[in-house]
Amino acid sequence: STIHTNNAAETITRILNMWVKAFLIPASVNAIIAQRLVKKLCSCKKEVNIKDIGEDIIKSVKNAINITDKQELSFRVWDKLKKPVFYKSVGCKKCDWSWYSWRTWIYEVLEITPWVKEMILSWSSAFNINRQAIKDWMISLEQDGVMKALNGLTSLEEIYRVAKSQKG
């Protein structure tokens, strides 16, 4: 089923607001996936000088990748964290000067862990459920997007254009 929310945790509060009894959610849901489509950079991309990226974006990136004890997050970008390189497109005939070609997706998977289950049963806020899910090793939309930007699939600007609505 599809429920339009900004992140996976908001799905729980949306269901609760539809007067579904709280005990039914963990009894019938194992995981919730939130996803967003992001534009992929064209092959005409070039490296961006870190100094040219806005300080607010750099701060957000540092916060997103600061949780380096996550095995999956570390495994996917560990070598790139030592000297991060981000890209932007310059435009060409192939992308019709739009800088992007096709799309890819960023996603997060919120598993209904025992801690999350307790929070659902006590009607915790989406913000607190999201925080707990991240403690329980969920990789957020923002973190997945930063990993894709570090791998040159998309730009930081695109990630923060799409993922900004899911913050706090």
Where do the protein language model's features map onto the residues?
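Short, flexible helix-loop junctions that flank or precede catalytic/ligand sites
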Residues: 1-168
